[in-house]
Amino acid sequence: MQKRVISGILALVLVLTLTLTLAQADVRVELDGIDGGSASVTVPEDDSAALLEGYLYQLNGLEAPETVVKAEGGGNTASRPATYMASMNPTLRAVYDQLVPEIQKIAAGQGSSSAFSLGIQMTFTKEELGIEGDMLVRGDDGQYHFSEETGAAIEKAVNEVMDMDMLLNQLLAHHPYELYWFDKSFSEGAIRVKYSYGTDGQQTVMVGDFVIMMAVSQDYAVTDAATQQYYLYSPDTAKTGAASAAAATAAQVVAENQGKGAYSKLVAYREYITKAVDYNFDVANTANYPYGDPWQLIYVFDGDDTTNVVCEGYSKAFKYLCDLTWTGSDPEVVCYLPTGTMDGEDHMWNIVSIGGVNYLTDITNCDSYADGTAAIGYPDQMFLCGAAGGVDEGYTVDILGQRKVLYTYDDKGTKSIYDDRELVLSATKYSPLTFDLNQLIALARYAAGITTDESAAIDVNNDGIISAADLTAMAQSLVS
């Protein structure tokens, strides 16, 4: 409710009070002050999942993967942080600078309120507001009130300075991943400003008590266990803190395997994931269950054996560990995240590129379960395996002693993101190279030009050239 009642003439200031009240499906913050401007944007339904993934990558100093940032990726997308800052008026820039650290605290699980009080004051003269009549008029109750002309003029002046559309756009452009918890499409104003004002007489208006409120997505808000209603401006620190904890755990997994060779690292990551979680059959059996659950990646690293995942969690966790391990412009191993179908059922898996060759990897189907059963590819029949077929018709994996499984790529979520070089698969299973020390020495002598003995000309990485790259590949294989 907007209250513009001023009791008395001197030092007339509205009092701002903040109360939280439960309402159907959400919580409203009621402010005994002026409801100023607001802004919202339209986003894909699963955008919050992409932003959370981006935040997990950002926490460990990495750029988000292509499946997060490419707009063609089936809706599960987000933009990379912008590098160019649009021009804002000094007051709005001050608001922006105050909000950024508060947003970062919430993202890290350290902030429990998304209603931020600002230490900002504005003063307007009657002339600046363009008011021709009296600012204060006596009402039927005998009290003085701001005139309608004055109220409209103040609202216009404040909104020109506190441009919510500009503020929201700049926050989303420069801190997209840290705003994974923010409900940017909330219909009643994802970001809103409240304020109060008063006057010292008939010539000057003082505006203050500014509060910026940012709506919290239901996935990350404090929720009443009995009613399942949630508080719109109360982040649940247990939920928002889970992202930082998961990122730290994943980094620890990588650190613990740092001294191993490439193949041994991949095996260790597979074993970690399959021990950390089981397949969530309850979720998988839910009709039309969509990709984009923001918790799938976190569940693998939360240390809780009651939180399990579907294929999305297995494959994204494996890619995350690979991306944390192999960085730079020319990584030894690259992990991709295709979506499509497995024998006609929606599925997500991995492609691992190692030594310039791509191998199908399905961690989901390499798992065993607490009840003693196991997936069709347990323990490693669908790990860096061979597959026959092609990009358009799909690839078939022959599981010895069982059956053949057909994988097909999704046009929008996979073929539009990756090219054929990344989707063409090896027909044979990856085999770790095994060499002895004499072969390593012989190849080193050949690569260095010390000898021309062709018996040492081993094309280790299968690139058609005998070079120092083969020496590197052989050395790496010796520690795998």
Model-flagged regions — what are they?
Residues 16-33, 331:
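Sec-dependent signal peptide cleavage junction
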Residues 255, 271-279, 319, 323-327, ...:
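Sec-exported extracytoplasmic/periplasmic mature domains
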Residues 269, 293, 306-322:
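Active-site nucleophilic cysteine motif
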Residues 234-303:
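Secondary-structure boundary elements
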Residues 20-25, 431-480:
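Cellulosome-associated attachment modules in secreted, modular CAZymes
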Residues 26-217:
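Intrinsically disordered, low-complexity N-terminal segments that are enriched in acidic
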Residues 312-393:
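Hydrophobic/aromatic-rich core segments of domains that either
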Residues 2-24:
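Sec-dependent N-terminal signal peptides of Gram-positive bacterial secreted proteins and lipoproteins
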